[in-house]
UniProtKB/Swiss-Prot annotation:
Sites of N-palmitoyl cysteine lipidation: 19
Residue intervals passing through the bilayer: none
Subunit structure: Forms homooligomers.
Leader sequence segment: 1-18
Function comment: The induction of Slp may help to stabilize the outer membrane during carbon starvation and stationary phase.
Domain of life according to the entry: Bacteria
Cellular location(s): Cell outer membrane
Membrane topology reported for the UniProt record: Lipid-anchor
Protein name: Outer membrane protein Slp
Length: 188
């Protein structure tokens, strides 16, 4: 009996570890409001300076300096797994600063979630229009890869052409080649 309980506890712990929702590198210090509203922070950044926050979106520019790298991120709201909601509207932009070199190939045009400390705002431009960017010092980053899930139709009720036709024949359900839906999703 003890062996069964031990196996059950071990398997449940593996199951729970596999289902952990937010990657460790962007988990943060477990404060309840770490996933802040970007709009609220952007409107009054002075209230949030020094606080840890998690934001996500699409990296649209990578600026390498002598000692650090800035990621310009077009911000999207995050879901409960800290993934950017790719079907939502963009909320604004932020600059995420990381000491050292980050290769633009690994980040530009990718969806990311960052964890960092809010530093305030930094004036800049989007094209030639003045814009105040929220500035964040990065402590962690998760790059998400876009995967398209293709759902095809599976017809359970139509059994083919008849007994004298080759497969699928009678009694064999068949797949149609029609694509009914393509759903984009983000994965690690």
């Amino acid at each position: 009996m003890n062996m069964t309980k031990g196996a059950l506890i071990l398997s449940l712990s593996f199951l729970l570890a596999a289902c952990s929702s937010i990657p460790q590198n962007i988990k943060g210090n477990n404060q309840p409001d770490i996933q802040k509203s970007f709009v609220a922070v952007h409107n009054q950044p002075g209230l949030y300076v020094g606080q840890q926050a998690r934001f996500g979106g699409k990296v649209i520019n990578v600026i390498n300096g002598k000692t650090d790298t800035l990621l310009e991120i077009s911000v999207l709201p995050l879901d409960s797994y800290a993934k950017p909601d790719i079907e939502a509207n963009y909320q604004g932009r932020l600059l995420a600063r990381q000491s050292g070199f980050l290769d633009p190939v690994n980040y530009r045009n990718h969806f990311v979630t960052i964890l960092g400390t809010i530093q305030g705002e930094q004036p800049g431009f989007i094209n030639k229009v003045p814009y105040n960017f929220l500035e964040v010092n990065m402590q962690g980053i998760q790059v998400w890869h876009l995967r398209e899930v293709v759902n095809t139709t599976y017809n359970l009720w139509d059994y083919g052409y008849g007994a004298f036709w080759p497969e699928p024949g009678w009694g064999a359900p068949y797949y149609t080649n029609a694509v009914s839906q393509v759903t984009p999703e983000l994965v690690k």
